[in-house]
Amino acid sequence: MKKTASHNQDGEYHQEGLLQLTLEGLIPPNQILVLNLELRTATLFYNVPEGNQTMVEQQHFSPNGMRVLVPLLRAYPKYCLHEVLFASLVSLPLEEAYQQMLEMRALTIRSVRRAVASLPSRLRAFGWQVRSIRGAGYLIEAIPTG
């Protein structure tokens, strides 16, 4: 079986169930976040000067938590639309998710809100929080210090 890997210009690296993100501004430049989509884990690694990596933090997420975490992180530093989160949550193409949200707004928003509500305790370990952008979506950001 051949392993496939791809890079994109936003600092993402994807390889069979692994998603690596640099998240400039959310994590230090010498760290990388690796999402294991199968195990539903997020692991923060520190790149040691000798070329090795040291694990800084790891958290395990619920299935729905991981389904909304991925688009939130991909949207960073911008917010992620409710429609994108709902599409990821229910595994629908964006157009279908948008149509369902038009037809059943309260129900779809509630399911997104419930999935996002599972994130804060896990994200705190990384020093992050999720903020609601009223009527639009959610934003992942660093917890303000001070």
What are these regions (language model features)?
Residues 53-97, 119:
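Short amphipathic alpha-helical recognition elements used for nucleic-acid or partner binding
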Residues 91-110:
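Short, positively charged loop/turn segments that connect secondary-structure elements
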Residues 2-3, 78:
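Context-gated lysine
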